[in-house]
């Protein structure tokens, strides 16, 4: 790393510590040429995978679109912004954990449904009705019955 004081390219690391809940490394460095000390921060560059839509087109992951869709499902439901943000963070982490450059949008949809089922069952049904394109009352009934058979995740 170049010294910000004299532009020499020989520096040594004096101290390294994890910061920001382990997501960042803080390093104290010393320039071998001029002796000045400075601090650097390192973070991993975490790139979200692109989404492959059902029609085969590809688009970048859009966190705001994800948030808006989940907020729409959670509208007028007793779920805090903090819990919503935690769910979004888990979805993003799971997408990154695939290690893939591209994932099918269906994967994202299923992750959203899993998180919504943990947050609020009504929001889950709202989202599922649009996502799975429910056509009639029977499809709603079947999904509600399936949800009722599962152990409660939101209580």
Curated annotation (Swiss-Prot):
Note accompanying the cofactor annotation: Binds 1 zinc ion.
Keywords noted in UniProt: ATP-binding, DNA-binding, Metal-binding, Nucleotide-binding, Repressor, Transcription, Transcription regulation, Zinc, Zinc-finger
UniProt-recorded Gene Ontology molecular function terms: ATP binding; DNA binding; zinc ion binding
Zn finger limits (unnamed): 3-34
Cofactor or coenzyme needed: Zn(2+)
Domain (ATP-cone): residue spans on this chain: 49-139
Any one of the GO BP annotations: negative regulation of DNA-templated transcription
Keyword Metal-binding applies: yes
Keyword Zinc among record annotations: yes
Role played: Negatively regulates transcription of bacterial ribonucleotide reductase nrd genes and operons by binding to NrdR-boxes.
Family: Belongs to the NrdR family.
NCBIfam families: transcriptional regulator NrdR
Protein name from the UniProt record: Transcriptional repressor NrdR
Protein's organism: Ectopseudomonas mendocina (strain ymp)
The encoding gene: nrdR
